[in-house]
A protein has these predicted regions:
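GNAT-family acyltransferases
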Residues: 1-128, 191-192, 196-213
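Amphipathic alpha-helical recognition patches that constitute DNA-binding helices
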Residues: 43, 120, 137, 154, ...
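Conserved beta-strand-loop-alpha-helix junction that forms the acyl-donor binding cleft
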Residues: 126, 157-167, 184-187
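Conserved acetyl-CoA-binding loop-helix of GNAT-fold acetyltransferases
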Residues: 124, 131-148, 164-172
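Conserved active-site tyrosine of GNAT-family acetyltransferases
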Residues: 170, 175, 197
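Short, solvent-exposed loop/turn elements at beta->coil junctions and helix N-caps
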Residues: 107, 181-185
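Conserved GNAT acetyl-CoA-binding A-motif
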Residues: 148-158
Length: 213
């Protein structure tokens, strides 16, 4: 069974978000992050300790990350985000474990502002699996979750100026460039801009209709 949706409320298209498999996409599986699981602790620490992934995914001071940092990040993803999942490649054979390759989450609003119904995407893909379209696939999946399941009206994402390819990717996925904060970030001995992008529920539904024509 697949969930049928349209911007008018009339069933005009069939979305790929399957009710029977809501935590899968074409090539990926999205599983819960487990704060008490040693393997998840190791994986999140590994992501935090990859300099390129770390610098592109957040604007904190770049420095060696401890295992505690990985555990804290895992706890945030599992317990404090609106949704936070580990992105995995399916196991190649029955009984084997899925291969974790990244993490994606929607930040949760504080209780007194939830009526605004927006969230920001956080995404990290391990260096070995970058450049293969997994990040794009995961973003498309989390947008479906945001608008079809969580009932959000708006989803936001940011891109750092020293990673210009990220902003171009987000725009290809349908995000609109909404703001530029000039020279907000200090990195590599230079000042860099931060790009703010957003997508509304109606934007997303229009994209779904275009893809089904």
């Amino acid at each position: 069974m697949e969930l049928v949706c349209s911007s008018s409320g009339v069933s005009k298209q069939r979305n790929t978000f399957k009710l029977t498999e809501p935590f899968r996409s074409a090539r990926l599986i999205y599983r819960a992050a487990e704060p008490e699981e040693l393997e998840d602790q190791k994986f999140l620490t590994k992501i935090q300790q990859e300099p390129l992934s770390y610098q592109n995914a957040n604007v904190r001071l770049s420095k060696p990350q401890s295992s505690k940092s990985g555990k804290d990040y895992l706890k945030f993803v599992a317990e404090e985000a609106l949704i936070g999942v580990i992105i995995c490649l399916p196991a190649s054979e029955e009984g084997a474990s899925h291969t974790p390759i990244g993490i994606i989450h929607l930040d949760k609003l504080a209780p007194h502002i939830t009526h605004h119904r927006f969230a920001e995407i956080g995404l990290e893909i391990t260096t070995a699996y970058q450049g293969q379209g997994y990040g794009s696939e995961a973003i498309r999946w989390v947008l479906q979750f945001a608008f079809l399941t969580a009932g959000l009206h708006r989803v936001e994402i940011r891109a750092v100026g020293y990673n210009p390819g990220a902003a171009r990717l987000y725009e290809r996925l349908g995000f609109q460039r909404e703001g530029l904060i000039r020279e907000r970030l200090w990195f590599g001995g230079e000042w860099w801009d931060e790009v703010q992008l957003g997508m509304l529920e109606n934007d997303w539904r229009a994209l779904q209709e275009q893809e089904t024509k």
